[in-house]
């Protein structure tokens, strides 16, 4: 089974790190290799341009792929988006020079030139907004085009807005919100690799569910149990186990990482002791 992943760019490292958290580790010893073996038997990583991944998966050259949602939309590829990931978040925006004294798209009256690598997204957006524009298709950095005089405005990806600001631009409208996504060929369910793909998807979902969660173990005296349980948030309910030769219980629960200090303070005040907090690798439902 082949999975297409980015060979460079802002998604490459997060994708490799995510797959490692899932348990899929590639052998990247040869920087020139385009097909990378992994520790999963029969699973290979195909290193390609992020924007090419949707068409590669659509063609069946790879059963799975991880790319940006924006590239799936731009390519019009007929693929299944199976999982939206929690990284690679960005927006496709219409950005104009800060010197333009406008705050809304509707204030653009004259025909303008717009530089973008998102030709299809731009075309649909401009038609929808009834903006008269000539699209200047590029493959490199769009934000420099207005200062070069090659365009009046741009449609491009924005993460924080810092790069736009550095080039004297401001976002005027958000066209599309994007993040990394796991995509599959439409026929993946019928393929010989369906079982392997299903297992991989299960592990991916498990790794995502475990993000920013911690497991807490604590010992609670019998007479304090109800009070401690009442103070606990939980995915369902805490797990209880009677301690041998003791009038106490072991209580186990899963908590969002941000809530850890608050939870520890509450359960300790209510009588819990021997509190242990551990990382969670995966949560498989």
UniProtKB/Swiss-Prot annotation:
Its cofactor is Mg(2+). It comes from the Archaea. One of its GO terms (molecular function) is ATP binding. Keywords: Amino-acid biosynthesis, ATP-binding, Cytoplasm, Glycosyltransferase, Histidine biosynthesis, Magnesium, Metal-binding, Nucleotide-binding, Transferase. Coiled coil: none annotated. It is an enzyme of class 2 (transferase). Feedback inhibited by histidine. The keyword Glycosyltransferase applies. Pfam families: HisG (PF01634), HisG_C (PF08029). Its EC number is 2.4.2.17. GO terms for cellular component: cytoplasm. It is found in: Cytoplasm. It catalyses: 1-(5-phospho-beta-D-ribosyl)-ATP + diphosphate = 5-phospho-alpha-D-ribose 1-diphosphate + ATP. Transmembrane segments: none annotated. Pathway: Amino-acid biosynthesis; L-histidine biosynthesis; L-histidine from 5-phospho-alpha-D-ribose 1-diphosphate: step 1/9. One of its GO terms (biological process) is L-histidine biosynthetic process. Belongs to the ATP phosphoribosyltransferase family. Long subfamily. Catalyzes the condensation of ATP and 5-phosphoribose 1-diphosphate to form N'-(5'-phosphoribosyl)-ATP (PR-ATP). Has a crucial role in the pathway because the rate of histidine biosynthesis seems to be controlled primarily by regulation of HisG enzymatic activity. PANTHER family: ATP PHOSPHORIBOSYLTRANSFERASE, ATP PHOSPHORIBOSYLTRANSFERASE ATP-PRTASE. This is ATP phosphoribosyltransferase. It comes from Sulfurisphaera tokodaii (strain DSM 16993 / JCM 10545 / NBRC 100140 / 7) (Sulfolobus tokodaii).
């Amino acid at each position: 089974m082949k999975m297409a992943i980015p060979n460079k760019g802002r998604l490459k490292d997060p994708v490799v790190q995510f797959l490692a958290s899932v348990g899929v580790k590639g052998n990247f010893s040869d920087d020139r290799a385009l097909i990378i073996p992994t520790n999963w038997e029969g699973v290979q990583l195909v290193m390609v341009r992020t924007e090419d991944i949707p068409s590669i998966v659509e063609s069946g050259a790879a059963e799975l792929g991880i790319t940006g949602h924006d590239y799936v939309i731009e390519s019009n590829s007929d693929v299944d988006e199976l999982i939206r990931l929690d990284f690679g978040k960005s927006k496709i925006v219409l950005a104009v020079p800060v010197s333009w004294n406008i705050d809304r798209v509707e204030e653009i009256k004259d025909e303008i030139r717009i530089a973008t690598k998102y030709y299809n997204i731009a075309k649909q957006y401009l038609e929808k907004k009834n903006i008269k524009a000539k699209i200047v298709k590029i493959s490199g950095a769009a934000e420099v085009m207005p200062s070069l005089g090659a365009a009046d405005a741009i449609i491009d990806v924005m993460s924080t807005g810092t790069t736009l600001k550095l080039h004297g631009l401001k976002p005027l409208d958000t066209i599309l919100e994007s993040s990394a996504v796991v995509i599959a060929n439409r026929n993946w369910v019928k393929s010989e690799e369906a079982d392997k793909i299903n297992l991989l998807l299960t592990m991916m979902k498990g790794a995502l569910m475990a993000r920013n969660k911690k497991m807490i173990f604590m010992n609670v005296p019998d007479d304090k149990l109800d009070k401690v349980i009442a103070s606990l948030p939980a995915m369902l309910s805490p797990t209880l186990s009677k301690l041998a030769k003791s009038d106490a219980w072991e209580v186990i629960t899963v908590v969002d990482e941000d809530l850890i200090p608050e939870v520890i303070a509450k359960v300790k005040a209510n009588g819990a002791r021997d509190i242990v907090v551990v990382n969670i690798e995966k949560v498989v439902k």
